[in-house]
From Swiss-Prot:
This is Thiopurine S-methyltransferase. Keywords: Cytoplasm, Methyltransferase, S-adenosyl-L-methionine, Transferase. Its main location: cytoplasm. The gene is tpm. Signal peptide: none annotated. The keyword Transferase applies. It comes from Photobacterium profundum (strain SS9). GO terms for cellular component: cytoplasm.
Length: 213
């Protein structure tokens, strides 16, 4: 993912990927992760997602990583939270109650190991040449026995430029080779879906449970 591209998306408010409500995939499949209240939860490339609030109602330590300071400041402002802000090297850490967001480069922010991960928007934001590096970094942050709830998209990449990019099932299995991988759901969208209306021959959302061995 190009950092300047991401900054410009937020600066120009081109954030069609942002959901105003909690993602139904999260509410439906989070129980499969079997996370306890004290488990440390990581949300990479969290933006200003309201999913953070939902997770914070269930867990004592929810950690986001986000490159855009506009996104981070918007999250806290929109929820009327006043965070404590600490600068550490090239990153800023925003903390309020159960939620901590590291504003900085995903590949270099300093975070203690986590128990569970919710990835709805991070892997699919990565171009193909960055995905192995993204997953390598992610797995380095997850404790042995940790779990990842992963959401990916499957569509003909040649028919639409990303991001979000298509990450097909065989690539998921290759990237997370060595982990226990379970496909929880595949939601094939019909012709009424906006992406299909834009000319895609098919468009599906897949939900995965990745267990780190």
């Amino acid at each position: 993912m190009d950092a300047e591209f991401w900054h410009s998306r937020w600066a120009e408010n081109r954030i069609g990927f942002h959901l105003d409500d909690t993602n139904p995939v999260l509410t439906q499949y989070w129980p499969m992760v079997k996370a306890t209240r004290d488990d440390r939860v990581l949300v990479p490339m969290c933006g200003k997602s309201v999913d953070l609030v939902w997770l914070a109602q269930k867990h004592n330590n929810v950690i986001g990583i986000e490159l855009s300071d506009i996104a981070v400041r918007s999250f806290f402002a929109e929820h009327l939270y006043t965070p404590m802000v600490t600068s550490i090297g090239h990153e800023s850490v925003y903390a309020f109650d159960e939620i901590t967001i590291h504003c900085g480069d995903y590949f270099s922010v300093r975070i203690d190991p986590v128990d569970v991960v919710y990835d709805r928007a991070a892997l699919i934001a990565m171009p193909k040449n960055m995905r192995e590096m993204y997953v390598e970094r992610l797995l380095s942050l997850v404790k042995k026995g940790g779990r990842i709830l992963l959401v990916t998209l499957d569509y003909p990449q040649e028919q639409l430029n990303g991001p979000p990019f298509s990450v097909m099932s065989d690539e998921v299995r290759r990237l997370f080779d060595g982990c226990n991988i379970t496909l929880l759901a595949r939601d094939e969208k019909d012709e009424t879906h906006p992406r299909r209306k834009n000319g895609l021959s098919h468009f599906a959302e897949e939900t995965w449970l990745i267990e780190v061995a």
